Amino acid sequence: MKEMKVIIAGPRGRMGHEAVLLMERTEHFNLVAAVDYKHGGEKISDLPGMPALDAPIYADLHTCLEEVEADVLLDLTTPEVGKQHVTLAVERGLRSVIGTTGFTEEELKQLTETAKEKAVGTIIAPNFAIGAVLMMKFSQMAAKYFQDVEVIELHHDQKLDAPSGTAVKTVELIRQNRESKQQGHPNEVEQLEGARGANVDGIHIHSVRLPGLIAHQEVMFGGDGQMLTVRHDSFNRASFMSGVKLSIETVMNLDHLVYGLENIID
């Protein structure tokens, strides 16, 4: 397979660290640079626990793109920074794989239009775990037969956004196979605000944030005399790397924006 030159934004995070290790062990990936505002001017090998890679670190993406030739930007930063990075990448014609969440419908619409206009491949993935993507697809299938459903997503207590992008994407897929319906008793009253979680077209999403968790979600379907639970658990960040690898390889052949790994797996 042809060599792919990759820039990683956010190498110091747990996901970023796993991604650097992925670069090291994948023959056709070449980490040509990283972006980290705290370590501009250093090399990847200067960071604690990193492999001996000489890729330079830049304090900002704009400077990095001025000096480095790359095929793909892999962004694993925060939601706000990720939005800035993908916008810049698309405008510059650089393919990007974005692992941050929190995009609004309007932001996705604008990015989709710009990516199409520029003919630049872009993948935004709420979840890189292949198992999580299958969990979403199975939930979409089940929604055709079970109209009553609620979603519980559980993550580590350092996650900044709630509900998770995976939960939101799951509900979007379920809605495609489910008529609009308010879940629960029509006259129910919350004695404490938020007790029933977020409400998306009648589907409730409950967010849990605790130390010790990584990324987990269960989708609970209820029916007469039965219940179906579809659950996925990520126990470490290595679970996301197969999806990261697939995304980088796939985005090279795209000329538009794709939202969600379920749209690129067979």
Swiss-Prot record:
- Which biological process terms from the Gene Ontology are attached to this UniProt entry? diaminopimelate biosynthetic process; lysine biosynthetic process via diaminopimelate
Q: Which InterPro entries match?
A: DapB_C, DapB_N, DapB_N_CS, DHDPR_bac, NAD(P)-bd_dom_sf
Which GO molecular function annotation, any one, does this entry have? NAD binding
Domain of life, per UniProt, equals Bacteria
List UniProt keywords, sorted A-Z: Amino-acid biosynthesis, Cytoplasm, Diaminopimelate biosynthesis, Lysine biosynthesis, NAD, NADP, Oxidoreductase
Xref: PROSITE patterns:
DAPB
Q: Where does (S)-2,3,4,5-tetrahydrodipicolinate bind?
A: H156, G165, T166
Sequence positions that bind NADP(+)? K38
Write down any Gene Ontology CC term. cytosol
Family classification: Belongs to the DapB family.
This protein is called 4-hydroxy-tetrahydrodipicolinate reductase
